[in-house]
Amino acid sequence: MAWSRLMLAACLLVIPSEVAADCLSLCSLCAVRTQDGPHPINPLICSLECQDLVPPSEEWETCRGFWSFLTLTASGLHGKDDLENEVALEEGYTALTKLLEPLLKELEKGQLLTSVSEEKLRGLSSRFGNGRESELLGTDLMNDEAAQAGTLHFNEEDLRKQAKRYGGFLRKYPKRSSEMTGDEDRGQDGDQVGHEDLYKRYGGFLRRIRPKLKWDNQKRYGGFLRRQFKVVTRSQENPNTYSEDLDV
């Protein structure tokens, strides 16, 4: 970069300043306009070609075409002839086509690829349409049957694992829900029928503990204290004892 800048400065010192300024302005404008394109213009080479210090190449030609295209509106305002305007338009269009050629080629390649892929997909769909639907349905049915067989086998394996884990405990002592259903079906006297809610609520707790305590003719804590701690409540004492104490 430093060597190129020194060369540019030397060239500017040798040639007249007006021509150098014009070439630099034109090339800088072209470089700014084409910096986002696929082939940006190098302002140094363009200015050297403009000043005839380097043999002309594509840089200066494309820049000149751009400049003619950009100065078309200004030339129309100044009142130039239509022929000159047409020439400027043609030059600008040629420069644009030169710059846009690689982009157009890439777009055409992409369109060709998409068309080829669409044709391949159509061919595949036509092949599948000619007798492949029945095969697909058959494979689906086979997969469903295999899945059902796998679930049955899995359930059998689970039962075997449970039997091994509990040592046949489930076989000897079935679940309480099955016992309850059997009791309700067998019960004719009304003893076991209707207790399912209680068993669900307490989890069989009522069956395991001692029978229901009879609290007949007992007040709030009288029977409990008498049974557990052998405490006589005041309500069970003889009222005559209080009358004797008062008489004394």
Curated annotation (Swiss-Prot):
Please tell me whether the keyword Phosphoprotein is annotated for this protein.
Answer: no
Modifications the protein undergoes after translation, according to the UniProt entry: The N-terminal domain contains 6 conserved cysteines thought to be involved in disulfide bonding and/or processing.
Give the GO biological process terms.
chemical synaptic transmission; neuropeptide signaling pathway; response to immobilization stress; response to nicotine; sensory perception
Region: Disordered; residue ranges are 174-195
Name the source's superkingdom: Eukaryota
Mind telling me which residues form the propeptide?
22-163, 177-199
Q: What are the subcellular locations of this protein? A: Secreted
Per UniProt, which keywords does this protein have? Cleavage on pair of basic residues, Disulfide bond, Endorphin, Neuropeptide, Neurotransmitter, Opioid peptide, Secreted, Signal
Q: Where is the composition biased (Basic and acidic residues)?
A: 183-195
> Where does the signal peptide begin and end?
1-21
Q: Name one GO cellular component term.
A: dendrite
Is Disulfide bond among this UniProt entry's keywords? yes
Which GO-annotated molecular functions does the record name? opioid peptide activity
Q: Which InterPro entries match?
A: Opioid_neupept, Proenkphlin_B
Outline what the protein does.
Answer: Leu-enkephalins compete with and mimic the effects of opiate drugs. They play a role in a number of physiologic functions, including pain perception and responses to stress. Dynorphin peptides differentially regulate the kappa opioid receptor. Dynorphin A(1-13) has a typical opioid activity, it is 700 times more potent than Leu-enkephalin.
The family note in this entry says:
Belongs to the opioid neuropeptide precursor family.
Report what the protein is called. Answer: Proenkephalin-B
The gene from which this protein is expressed is: Pdyn
